[in-house]
Amino acid sequence: MRGKGTSMKIEGVKLRLYAVTDRAWAADEDALMDQIAAAIDGGAGIVQLREKHLDHAAFLQEARRFVALCREKGVISIINDAVDIAAAVGADGVHVGQSDLAAGRAREVLGPDKLIGVSAHSVEEALAAQAAGADYLGVGAAFVTGTKADAAPISRDTIRAITAAVDIPVVAIGGISRDNITELAGCGLDGVAVVSALFAQKDVKTAAKELYALSESIAR
């Protein structure tokens, strides 16, 4: 049974608006940093840097800038998948999927004080992630998404079952927009993770403000 949306290391309120980056809408690294800053200024309390196509050296350089920006702004910095990069740049944590480095192994690399988020699509996966030491979960896909074509949507009942089963914060991810976010009301969520609903917008800061307010209205 869930508590009040907190873990030992992260408060659910920090997860109200979880920004996940995508280079598709940034011309270069400078533009990406500007977008991240705007998302934070609009209310994002945690940002995940996701890079699937950069080489190691370029990713490392970008991650250093990213972590420095998040520290300056006072928000949580998460690196997607790359545990070695997260450790090297001193990020606040890492997010891993079911097919990425297991949460237990990530904990071994990062130590006890860093945040580890895990993607889950079922109660079984959620409970396994919690048992392995996850600090929060990203569940979905909540809706059909163009960001990850292979991410099949899960039902609202499944989301509710996950949030009821675990004691750590949970955010929904996948196809979430200002038009459908309220459909997640009553699911026991601590927040939403968004990609295109934020970074594909012309005014990222305004989009963040709107999404934060909507997320606040449906949280838990």
Ranges and model annotations:
Residues R2-L101, E108-Y136, A151-I154, A161, ...:
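Conserved N-terminal beta1-alpha1 strand-loop-helix module at the mouth
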Residues V139, V171-I176, V192-S196:
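Glycine-rich beta-strand-to-loop/alpha-helix junction loops that act as flexible
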